[in-house]
Swiss-Prot record:
Homodimer. It catalyses: 2 3-(7-chloroindol-3-yl)-2-iminopropanoate + H2O2 = dichlorochromopyrrolate + NH4(+) + 2 H2O + H(+); 2 2-iminio-3-(indol-3-yl)propanoate + H2O2 = chromopyrrolate + NH4(+) + 2 H2O + H(+); 2 H2O2 = O2 + 2 H2O. Keywords: Heme, Iron, Metal-binding, Oxidoreductase. Its cofactor is heme. This is Dichlorochromopyrrolate synthase.
Length: 1013
C-alpha cells in the first residue's frame, strides 16, 4: 500500500521555496481581483510603485515580495529498504541525487525547468500547493558525468497535507507510461532493479513520492525560505491515493500505520510528538493492548517494526510524560476521506444554469485504512481574509453560513451550500462544485454530521492560524472561485487597447508580484509586451495551466482575461504594411593532433554556427508575418491553406508554420554558437565573434558549402539540407580498383559540417592538457532551446564546459540537434535540423505541384528580398541597396547587431565563469534581438531596395569588430551612449515602430543607471 510497499528509497536534504509573500498580507480582495490601500480599492490605473511604497510603509510586503514561485530541492538518497525493517546504506543509489523539476516548455525548449509553489488562496496559511512536472533520481554530479537512473513525468497539483506546527507534506505519483524512463544503470542497484521490475511487469503502476518539509528558515538566496526535507520513494498501484498519504490515519501529530502479519509500518515522515513525551507505543484504543514500539527519532520517516496482532480495534499512540503519566498522543480516525484533487480553481459561471464551469470532485472513503462505503457530509467555510472590502464577511460576528463561495450538488439538479454523499462498496463517490461568488473557501468532508466548528464565527472556524489544531487531520478541499469577467468577451476586439489590457489583466500582478519587473520585464511597459507577444501568450494560454511554466504562476487568470490578452496580441501582430508586387514588362582528413589545429577548427565551428543562424533568420524574416499573410489572403495572393502552411495559426498554439520552424532552428543555432564558444573558452581562448561577409564567406570556411542570405524557397531550403546533412550521407568515393585519394596534411577542408565536428570530437580526446578552467567554473550556462529529449535525460544540463566529458557532451549535443541520433539511438520524436528542412522542402514542393495541378497562379512563399544585401557594395555576389530609406534602416539594424554581439563580448570578457542566463548583459543582448533587430528585420523585408523587383533585408554587416572594454565604468557609459545614439537615429525614421525606439531608450537608461553585470 503506497509508501508501505517495498522496496523503498529514503532521501533527505533541503527544499527551497520562493513563494511570493505580497499577496498574503490580507490586503488582496479575491472577490474583485483588486488590492486594498487605506481600506479602499487601489485604482489599477495608478503606478505600481505608489502601491509598493504603501506596502513598505505598512509592512505589507513580507519577506519574499519578489518571490517567483520556484520550488527546488537539494537532496540525496540516504538508504534503501528491500526487506521489511532492513535498512541498507550500501546500495549504489545511496548518495545519489533526487530531483524535482518543472514541465518542459515546448516554446522556449528549456532545460533546468523549475517546479512551482503557489497559494490557491493567497490570504490563507493552508493552501500552498506544489506543482512538479518531472521527477528523477540517481545522478551523481552532472547527469552527463554519471546519469540518472530514473526520470518520469508528473501531472497535476500536489496539495499540502498534514499542516501542523510549521510542517507540511506533499505527495505525488509518477505513473508508468511514455513519460517514464529507466536507464541502464538501474540494473546496478538491487533496489532500483526491483522497482523497475515491479513497474514493467505490471505488478505496480508507477512510483509514489512523499516530500515532508519542516523547520523553515531563511535561505542563502533572497526572497526564499529553506526547509529541512525528508522523503520516500516506493511502488504505487492504481486505485491508491495520488496526493494523500495512505494507511490508517492517527491524529493529531499526524502519522499513518499499516499492520501486516507480524510487523507494522509507520509513516512518521511528518510526525513530531509533543515536547517531553517519550516511550511511544502503538496500542489498541479501546482495550489498551500493546502492538508495537513507535521510534520517535528514526531518520528515514517510514519505518517497519515488529508488531502484535491488532484485531479490529481502532489504534492510538500512547506516550509517557516527564512526570510518568501515560497520555494518548494520537488516536485513529476510523473513517477517513481522501480527495486527491484538493486544490481547485473554478471559473465563475456565466449565469445560474452554466454547468460548463462546474468541477467534479472524486472522493474515496476508508474505514481503518481499507476502502469502504461511508456517508460523507460536505460543508464550506469561507476565508474572511479573502474579502477585506466586504464588511459583512470581515465582521467579527460573521458565521460560516453568512457567505457561500460555492454551491454543491450530487445529482446536478439540487444545488446547496452543503451536501451529503454516499460512497460505494469500494469507497468511491463524487460531487459537483459550482462557483457561487468570487472568493476563497475551504470544504470540510466528514463522516459526522456535527463538526467541531459548529457555532463558531467564520474567522474562528476557518482558523487561519491553526489555533484549534483540528484542520490538519481532517479531509478538506481548498477552492478559489475566480472573478466574474465574462463581460470582457463582449468587448469589440478592435477596442482592446493596451490601457484596457493593463487595467483589466496586468495591473493586479504588477501590484503584487515584483519578480516579473525585476527578473524579466515589467508588464506596464507596452513596448516590452509588444516585443514578446508569442512568448506571453504561450505562458498565459489556459491550455497550459496544468504546466509549471504557466503564467501567472498563481493560476488565477480567468478565461475572459486570457482571451482579451490574445485579442490584443493578435491585433499587434496584424499591424503591418504589405508591399505590392506589380508585374513588369521591361571528414576525411588529417586528424587534429595539436592545440593550434583544434583551436582553428573550433573557431571555424563558431563562425559556421553564426553564419547558419543568420541565414536561417534571413530566410525566416523573408516570410510574411501572420498578420501580413492575412492581408495577402484578403488580396487573393495567398490562400488560407498557404497562410497556415507558412505562418501557422498566428500564435494561438506553438504551430508557427514554416516561419516558426525556421525561427526555432535559428534559436538552436544561436545556442550552438554559444556552446562551441564555451568549448573554445574552456581550452583557454577568448570568446570568439567572427566578422562574417556573405560575399566572401564561402572562400574562407573549412567546408565546401554555400552560405548566403536569400529568401526562403526550394533553392535555399536545399542549401540548408546540404549544410545539415548527417555524416553518414557523405562517404568516400570509389571507382573500381582506383585507390581512395588521401588528403595532404595542409588540406583542412571537410566534406560536411558533420565531418568537422567529428574531427573536433576526436581532437578533444587526442590533444593532452587542453582544459585550463577549474571544474565548476566553465561559465556560459544557459538553458533555453535545448529540447525535451535532452530535458528528459539531462534536466540539469546548462551548456557548461569545464573538462573533456562536458566538452564531448557539448559537441554531441550540437550534432544531435543538427543531424539526430547522436546522444541516443532511440526515436525521440523530435526533428533534427536536417529533418526539418527535408520536411519544409516537401511541403513547398507539394504546394507548388498543387498550384500546377489546379492551374493557380505561381505562388511565392516569401518577399522578393535581395540576395546578400549590402550598404557597402563590393563584389558581384552581393546586392547593393540604393534606396535611402532602406539604407537608413539597414544601418540602424547593423549597428543594433553590433550591440548584440558587443554585449556578449562584454559578458564573457568581464565575467567568463558567471551565469549567462542571469547576466544583465546577455539578457540585454536578447532584448536587442527580440525588441530591436526582429522588428527592424520584419520591416526591412517589406521596403523597396532600389533594385528592380527587390526589397531590402538585414545584412548583418559590422563596421567594426566588437571588443571587450576592460573598465566597467567606461563600458557602461560607452554602451549607454551607443544605445542613446541608436534611439535618436530610430526616432528620426518614420517607419521604425515605436516599440523599437522605446526598447533602445530603455536599454540606454538601463546602462546609464545600472551598468553591465
Amino acid at each position: 500500500m503506497s509508501v508501505f510497499d517495498l522496496p523503498r528509497l529514503h532521501f533527505a536534504g533541503t527544499a527551497t521555496t520562493r513563494l511570493p509573500t505580497g499577496p498574503r498580507n490580507g490586503l488582496v480582495d479575491l472577490s474583485t481581483h483588486s488590492v486594498v490601500m487605506d481600506g479602499e480599492r487601489f485604482p489599477a490605473s495608478r503606478p505600481a510603485a505608489e502601491y509598493h511604497a504603501y506596502l513598505d510603509r505598512v509592512g505589507g510586503k513580507g519577506t519574499a515580495f519578489a518571490g517567483n514561485g520556484y520550488f527546488a530541492i537539494d537532496a540525496g538518497i540516504t538508504a534503501v529498504e528491500r526487506a521489511a525493517g532492513e535498512v541498507d546504506t550500501g546500495d549504489l543509489l545511496v548518495g545519489r541525487a533526487v530531483d524535482v523539476w518543472g514541465h518542459y516548455n515546448e516554446y522556449l525548449a528549456t532545460t533546468f525547468n523549475r517546479a512551482r509553489i503557489f497559494d490557491v488562496d493567497p490570504s490563507s496559511s493552508w493552501t500552498s500547493t506544489v506543482m512538479i512536472g518531472q521527477f528523477g533520481f540517481g545522478r551523481l554530479g552532472r547527469s552527463h558525468d554519471v546519469g540518472y537512473v530514473f526520470t518520469g513525468g508528473v501531472h497535476g497539483m500536489q496539495p499540502p497535507r498534514w499542516h501542523e506546527d510549521g510542517r507540511v507534506l506533499h505527495q505525488f505519483t509518477v505513473p508508468a507510461g511514455e513519460d517514464m524512463t529507466w536507464f541502464g544503470s538501474a540494473a546496478d542497484s538491487p533496489a532500483a532493479a526491483r522497482l523497475r521490475e515491479l513497474v514493467e511487469s505490471g505488478e505496480a503502476d508507477g512510483l509514489v513520492v512523499q516530500l515532508a518539509l519542516s523547520d523553515a528558515g531563511p535561505a542563502p538566496m533572497p526572497h526564499a525560505q529553506q526547509w529541512r526535507l525528508r522523503g520516500t520513494i516506493a511502488p504505487w498501484h492504481a486505485g491508491e491515493p495520488r496526493t494523500c498519504p495512505a494507511g490508517r490515519l492517527l491524529t493529531p501529530h499526524n502519522l499513518t500505520a499499516d499492520l501486516r502479519g507480524d510487523h507494522v509500518s509507520l509513516n512518521l515522515i511528518s510526525f513530531r510528538p509533543p515536547t517531553g513525551i517519550s516511550g511511544l507505543e502503538l496500542r489498541t484504543a479501546d482495550t489498551d493492548r500493546f502492538i508495537a514500539r513507535v521510534p520517535a527519532d528514526d531518520p528515514h520517516g517510514v519505518v517497519t517494526v515488529p508488531a502484535a496482532e491488532g484485531g479490529d480495534e481502532a489504534l492510538c499512540v500512547v506516550g509517557t510524560t516527564a512526570a510518568g503519566e501515560r497520555i494518548v498522543v494520537s488516536r485513529e480516525r476510523e473513517v477517513t476521506v481522501h480527495v486527491d484533487d484538493a486544490s481547485v480553481f473554478l471559473e465563475h459561471p456565466r449565469g445560474p444554469g452554466d454547468s460548463d464551469q462546474d468541477a467534479e470532485i472524486a472522493v474515496r472513503t476508508y474505514v481503518r485504512g481499507e476502502p469502504a462505503a461511508a456517508t460523507i457530509h460536505i460543508g464550506q467555510y469561507f476565508n474572511p481574509r479573502a474579502f477585506p472590502l466586504d464588511e459583512h464577511a470581515t465582521a467579527a460576528s460573521a458565521t460560516p453560513e453568512d457567505l457561500d463561495v460555492v454551491a454543491l450538488c450530487v445529482d446536478g439538479t439540487r444545488w446547496s451550500r452543503h451536501c451529503v454523499i454516499s460512497t460505494d462498496e469500494n469507497g468511491d463517490g463524487r460531487f459537483l462544485l459550482r462557483g457561487a461568488r468570487p472568493g476563497a473557501t475551504r470544504l470540510l468532508l466528514s463522516a459526522e454530521g456535527a463538526t467541531p466548528f459548529d457555532g463558531l464565527t467564520a474567522a474562528a472556524a476557518y482558523d487561519n492560524d491553526d489555533s484549534l489544531g483540528l484542520w490538519s487531520g481532517l479531509a478538506s478541499v481548498a477552492v478559489r472561485v475566480l472573478p466574474d469577467h465574462w463581460w470582457m468577451d463582449d468587448i469589440p476586439r478592435d477596442k482592446v487597447t493596451f490601457d484596457l489590457l493593463y487595467r483589466e489583466v496586468f495591473a493586479f500582478y504588477e501590484l503584487l508580484y515584483s519578480f516579473m519587473g525585476e527578473e524579466v520585464f515589467s508588464l506596464a511597459d507596452r513596448f516590452r509586451v509588444e516585443t514578446h507577444p508569442r512568448l506571453i501568450w504561450q505562458m498565459c494560454d489556459p491550455r497550459n495551466r496544468a504546466k509549471t511554466y504557466y503564467m501567472p504562476p498563481t493560476r488565477d487568470l480567468t478565461g475572459p482575461q486570457a482571451r482579451l490578452l490574445l485579442a490584443y496580441l493578435r491585433a499587434q501582430n496584424s499591424d503591418v504594411v504589405v508591399p505590392v508586387i506589380e508585374p513588369s514588362h521591361t571528414r576525411s582528413g588529417t586528424p587534429i593532433s595539436t592545440r593550434t589545429d583544434l583551436v582553428r577548427a573550433l573557431r571555424h565551428g563558431v563562425a559556421i554556427e553564426l553564419a547558419v543562424m543568420l541565414q536561417y533568420l534571413y530566410a525566416a524574416f523573408s516570410i510574411p508575418t501572420h498578420g501580413a499573410g492575412q492581408e495577402l489572403v484578403s488580396r487573393g495572393d495567398w490562400t488560407p491553406e498557404q497562410l497556415r502552411l507558412m505562418c501557422g495559426d498566428g500564435g494561438e498554439t506553438t504551430d508557427g508554420g514554416v516561419r516558426g520552424s525556421l525561427l526555432g532552428v535559428a534559436r538552436e543555432e544561436m545556442i550552438h554558437f554559444l556552446v562551441v564558444n564555451n568549448v573554445l573558452m574552456a581550452v583557454g581562448e577568448p570568446f570568439h565573434v567572427p566578422d562574417l561577409d556573405f560575399g566572401t564567406i564561402n572562400d574562407t570556411l573549412m567546408v565546401p558549402l554555400d552560405f548566403s542570405l536569400e529568401a526562403l524557397g526550394l533553392g535555399s531550403v536545399q542549401r540548408f539540407i546540404q549544410i545539415e546533412q548527417p555524416e553518414g550521407l557523405t562517404g568516400a568515393v570509389r571507382l573500381g580498383d582506383l585507390p581512395v585519394p588521401v588528403r595532404e596534411a595542409e588540406d583542412f577542408h571537410y566534406a560536411s559540417l558533420s565531418e568537422l565536428y567529428g574531427d573536433i570530437r576526436e581532437g578533444l580526446q587526442r590533444v593532452p592538457g587542453l582544459f585550463l578552467v577549474e571544474r565548476g567554473r566553465g561559465g556560459g550556462e544557459h538553458h533555453l532551446f535545448l529540447r525535451e529529449s535532452v530535458n528528459a535525460v539531462h534536466p540539469d544540463y546548462q551548456l557548461e564546459v569545464d573538462d573533456l566529458s562536458s566538452a564531448l557532451f557539448a559537441i554531441d549535443f550540437v550534432t544531435e540537434q543538427g543531424e539526430g541520433h547522436v546522444l541516443t539511438d532511440e526515436d525521440t520524436g523530435e526533428e533534427s535540423h536536417y529533418d526539418t528542412f527535408v520536411r519544409v522542402a516537401d511541403l513547398l514542393m507539394k504546394e507548388r505541384l498543387t498550384a500546377a495541378d489546379t492551374r493557380r497562379a505561381q505562388w511565392s512563399p516569401a518577399y522578393p528580398v535581395a540576395r546578400n544585401p549590402t550598404v557597402h557594395g563590393g563584389g558581384q555576389s552581393k546586392e547593393l541597396v540604393t534606396s535611402p530609406v532602406a539604407r537608413e534602416l539597414m544601418v540602424l539594424f547593423n549597428k543594433s547587431y553590433f550591440m548584440m554581439l558587443q554585449l556578449m563580448v562584454q559578458h564573457f570578457g568581464g565575467s567568463p565563469d558567471a551565469s549567462l542566463r542571469r547576466s544583465k548583459l546577455m539578457n540585454a543582448a536578447i532584448d536587442v534581438m527580440t525588441g530591436v533587430m526582429r522588428p527592424l528585420a520584419e520591416l526591412l523585408v517589406t521596403v523597396p531596395s532600389g533594385r528592380h523587383g527587390r526589397t531590402a533585408g538585414p545584412s548583418f554587416e559590422l563596421d567594426e569588430k566588437p571588443a571587450f572594454i576592460p573598465r566597467a565604468d567606461v563600458a557602461r557609459r560607452a554602451i549607454s551612449l551607443r544605445f542613446r545614439h541608436l534611439a535618436e537615429s530610430a526616432r528620426t525614421c518614420a517607419l521604425v515602430p515605436d516599440k523599437v525606439v522605446r526598447n533602445l531608450d530603455f536599454l540606454a537608461d538601463q546602462f546609464a543607471t545600472e551598468g553591465p553585470r
